[in-house]
Amino acid sequence: MKKLIAVISISALFLTGCGSSDASTVNQGASEFAQTVTDPSVVILDVRTPGEFSSGHLANAINIDVEGMQFNSEVSKLDKTKTYAVYCRSGRRSVIATDEMQKLGFTKLFNLEGGTGAWSAAGQTLVTN
């Protein structure tokens, strides 16, 4: 019995130590992300280039290019207590952006899996204003 308890205790300790470091980013498909961005308290962050942004973006999105020289300084100006819905064209850059945002202290992050490609394929619209 003591052996069993020891094995369970060690296993629990090991599994706890293997928790995801990405716990504060929730990856969502287009339909889930569409629900998330309807909440007016959520900040929608487009991390594509300004040119990509101007060709079509989610309504009410702000644009900070993750590959731009000023990404960290611009993101650092944002309120870390708010919830952010982050997207790009394919989902690759938004993962990079949410990783950087976590390092800066952001904890409430949602990532659009598949980016605007998945968004459009799901019948969701982009705006150009």
Q: What are the residue ranges of the model-derived segments?
A:
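Structural scaffold elements adjacent to functional motifs in cytosolic proteins
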Residues: 44-46
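Rhodanese-like catalytic fold shared by cysteine-dependent sulfurtransferases
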Residues: 2-7, 13-42, 51-83, 92-129
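Short cysteine clusters
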Residues: 88
